[in-house]
UniProtKB/Swiss-Prot annotation:
GO biological process, one term: secondary metabolic process
Enzyme Commission designation: 3.1.2.-
SUPFAM superfamilies in the cross-refs: alpha/beta-Hydrolases
Function comment: Esterase; part of the gene cluster that mediates the biosynthesis of the gamma-pyrones fusapyrone (FPY) and deoxyfusapyrone (dFPY). FPY is an undecaketide and thus likely synthesized by the polyketide synthase FPY1 from acetyl-CoA functioning as starter unit and the addition of 10 malonyl-CoA extender units by successive Claisen-condensations.
GO CC annotation terms, alphabetical: cytoplasm; nucleus
UniProt pathway: Secondary metabolite biosynthesis
Protein name: Esterase FPY3
Record PANTHER family: ESTERASE OVCA2 (PTHR48070), SERINE HYDROLASE FSH DOMAIN-CONTAINING PROTEIN-RELATED (PTHR48070:SF7)
Record organism: Fusarium mangiferae (Mango malformation disease fungus)
GO MF annotations, alphabetized: hydrolase activity
Length: 218
């Protein structure tokens, strides 16, 4: 399956490849996927702890989180990329990448088929309300402001209780249809753990469950 991979703010695709290396290795034993990475187009200072791995000129984001114009441009650019380079079976997003993936799915929630058959969210940031963005207002999309779920494809929500922003990841789950949700708290922080092997196994099983739900539709 083709999986589009979207990195976090202040990193890049090479960092996401490194972050997911153990998980992808574990998944290769049971499932065959092709991972395709897209870099953000906005320069951004490196995320905490990333400075040792990438230079200032390599540190990117998809959008500036306080700019409605920047966020809308990121949605439009990725929408166009998917139309030109797709179809993709699934999407994997970390932090800001997960937020952007959710905004793409939310934009297309009446589309058949949807842009992705499943989504894998790591330490997800909340998506923004596109209607508010169009009015120049940066406002999170929250379940209490929507009439039911806006994401109807199977979703894996993998986060850590030590993440200072874990409340956003948990709020993201409420935007997704309950039948397709798979939740996993890996117990760590704002990261995709590569050790211990038991945690990697747990994450792989969560992804496998979501892919299976997408394939069999239940």
């Amino acid at each position: 399956m083709r999986i589009l991979c979207l990195h976090g703010m202040g990193t890049n695709s090479k960092v996401l490849e490194m972050q997911t290396s153990a998980l992808r290795h574990q998944l290769s034993h049971s499932q065959s996927h092709k991972y395709e990475y897209v870099d953000g187009g906005e320069p951004m200072p490196p995320a905490p702890g990333i400075e040792a791995f990438i230079g200032q000129d390599e540190s990117l984001a998809y959008y500036h989180p306080h700019s409605a114009k920047s966020i809308l441009t990121a949605i439009d650019d990725l929408w166009e990329y998917i139309a030109e380079e797709g179809p993709f079976d699934g999407v994997l997003g970390f932090s800001q990448g997960a937020s952007l993936a959710a905004m793409i799915i939310a934009r297309a929630h009446h589309s058949d088929p949807p842009p992705f058959q499943f989504a894998i969210f790591f330490c997800a940031g909340l998506p923004y309300c596109e209607k508010s963005l169009s009015a120049g207002e940066v406002k999170f999309l929250r379940a209490e402001a929507t009439q039911g779920p806006v994401i109807h494809v199977p979703t894996a929500h993998i986060f850590g209780k030590k993440d200072p922003d874990v409340s956003y990841s948990k709020a993201m789950t409420e935007l997704c249809h309950p039948w397709g949700r798979v939740l996993l708290d890996h117990g760590a922080g704002h990261e995709i753990p590569r050790v211990p092997v038991e945690t990697v196994d747990d994450m792989a099983r969560a992804v496998e469950k979501v892919v299976t739900k997408a394939v069999i539709g239940q």
